[in-house]
Amino acid sequence: MNLKKTENALSLTLKNFIKSESFGGIFLFLNAVLAMVVANSFLKEGYFALWHTPFGFQVGDFFIGFSLHNWIDDVLMALFFLMIGLEIKRELLFGELSSFKKASFPVIAALGGMIAPGLIYFFLNANTPSQHGFGIPMATDIAFALGVIMLLGKRVPTALKVFLITLAVADDLGAIVVIALFYTTNLKFAWLLGALGVVLVLAVLNRLNIRSLIPYLLLGVLLWFCVHQSGIHATIAAVVLAFMIPVKIPKDSKNVELLELGKRYAETSSGALLTKEQQEILHSIEEKASALQSPLERLEHFLAPISGYFIMPLFAFANAGVSVDSSINLEVDKVLLGVILGLCLGKPLGIFLITFISEKLKITARPKGISWWHILGAGLLAGIGFTMSMFISNLAFTSEHKDAMEVAKIAILLGSLISGIIGALYLFALDKRAALKK
């Protein structure tokens, strides 16, 4: 398949996804920089105190709410993971993960890109209090990675962009599994049974193809609460909810009605302003077009801008701020080295080696239009862990390991920055080399 055909094969949803994620990545970067500046300025005491401010409401002697930091990490991030879950479901059903032939190469790449960084970190921090942070360098921040690759524009093959997106989606799925398996403590089975009951009700609604999002979202709040109380991180509830959202579109006459409305609009007289009749026709078209979308598409379309331009930038601003002063012990075990080497070395090596071996063994086939040099470049960009890595660091290190958490955040910022710069320069040089050969 040539480049033109590959580009045409990109769905409108995928193109919109690339656009929103890439620009969201730039906004993320600006918020991370702002957080570091504020955390090392005269405003730092207010900055750190802000996130511990309780936010909620009082009912008698009971306070219902969390600190601002917990609202961001547990509640708003649940909405982000809901969107991630919707993306994964869409890709599994209709996208690049919908068949073994399509999914095998990026999924195996994601697997290698998680195992190698995790092993590097674990090897350096084995038998230390910080060994539990092995999941930190395993993650990829899709918004940042896409932000970098989109800045390169046409210098990067479209097929490589598709590969990186699919790899990142598979990586997100892997990160969810890692969180569920390794960062869950003190399970409370009564609450888990309650969560299971909610999931069964959601499954019945899905089976009945209930298209209104309201019952799913209301039950989703209940599911979030049960999972939160069970000891499993509440973001897992959001992913489960995403898989319960219906994806079927209605089989009725609305598409025919849309055509008729379009003809009616074309037959009306045009002027400087829309007539009342034209406004009514356009309103009807909007309603019927929305009804043709599946609940999954409607929810994903609603969440994408909120996630990209509010939740993730706010998360970055709340979590990227680290006060770099003499009180920080950069020699806490080998956290700094483990995270940086995991992201900058483990990611590209893991992705390149496992895909190279799997193709030689005829397990997978490399997508047409991209070379092994391109795969290595994608591996470098996959080393941009940033927000997902920071999210896992918050789970891996509690307040008892504050030094390790702060060092991990510095390492994530440095490792992600190094990976992004080297990856961008590498792909730029690769394009220049190809141009000279022509």
Name these PLM-found stretches.
Residues 27-40, 80-86, 116-118, 198-203, ...:
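Hydrophobic core segments of alpha-helical transmembrane domains in multi-pass membrane transport
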Residues 69-81, 129-143, 184-197, 235, ...:
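Structural signature of hydrophobic alpha-helical transmembrane segments
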Residues 149-261:
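Functional cores that coordinate and move charged inorganic groups
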Residues 12-15, 83-98, 146-157, 200-211, ...:
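C-terminal ends of transmembrane helices
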